[in-house]
Design a protein with these regions (language model features):
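Conserved P-loop
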Residues: 1-71, 127-130
């Protein structure tokens, strides 16, 4: 299942995502992974959370990003949750191909029983209808 924290840039999506990670660490039985566009939040995350700076992996388009996520999932059978901060940037995704990418990520998450929680810099009204039930928070 995918879950989305949406809102315009600067509305506090990252804080909500980090708070969610902090709570999840206390209850998690498996692995947690946090993907971001930098290492900026390294010291805000528990050492039980794997921080991945996506800019270090030469991802140049959304198809490569989906493959990257597939690789993460395939290498950790205990993976519970993947957190994606600044989703549009780290996934190299635009509004034009957003639906395709979200559907692929949703299919992956359901097939391998991994929750994917992401922050998306878009208003709730801009998001596609098929994700309306996947919105965790709208700012």
């Amino acid at each position: 299942m995918i879950q989305i924290i949406c809102g315009e840039k600067g509305k506090g999506k990252t804080k909500i995502l980090l708070d969610h990670v902090s709570k999840a660490v206390k209850e998690a039985n498996g692995s947690l992974v946090y993907l971001d566009k930098s290492n900026q939040h390294m010291f805000e995350l528990s050492n039980r959370v794997r921080l991945i700076n996506c800019t270090e992996y030469m991802i140049s388009n959304s198809s490569e990003f989906v493959g990257f996520i597939s690789g993460i999932i395939s290498q950790d059978h205990d993976l519970e949750t993947i957190y994606l901060d600044s989703f549009l940037k780290v996934a190299k995704t635009t509004k034009d191909n957003l639906e395709v990418v979200l559907r692929k990520l949703n299919d992956l998450s359901e097939a391998f029983h991994v929750t994917i929680i992401m922050s998306v810099s878009m208003d709730r009204e801009e998001l596609l209808e098929f994700v309306s039930d996947k919105i965790l928070a709208a700012l």
